[in-house]
Amino acid sequence: MRLGKDGKVELIKRVPLFSKLSKKGLEEVAHIADELDLPKGKVMAVEGDRGREFFVLLEGEADVTKGDRSINTMKEGDFFGEIALVTKMPRTASVTATTPVRVLVITERDFGALIKHSDEVGRGVAEALAERIAPELPV
């Protein structure tokens, strides 16, 4: 069953990158999020590649690997790629569907256009990123 706008908003607001957004900002992000059905075995992220999309797992499971070692199993509600979407840093792990999956996807292009169009989304994402990296900065 496909998510409606409210379902997308509920998932997106759990993502730390979007935690500072108002309901309107969350709705703007939900508007650019696409639902995709992907087959078992589909590689959604490759370690070392530059991330160009952000994923929320809606149904199914995916294996997270670093090198040839499995480090985690992702399930419904888990997400990945949000930092790569903004920072353009390489992926730190690979993610492969171990069952057929349904995902919510936000592409770099759509997200970039939204940030240019929406001051609130741009500010909210910048604030959330600053809070995330501040503890790692030397004092």
Where does each model-flagged region fall?
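Cytosolic regulatory regions built on CNB/CRP/Popeye-like sensor folds
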Residues: 1-139
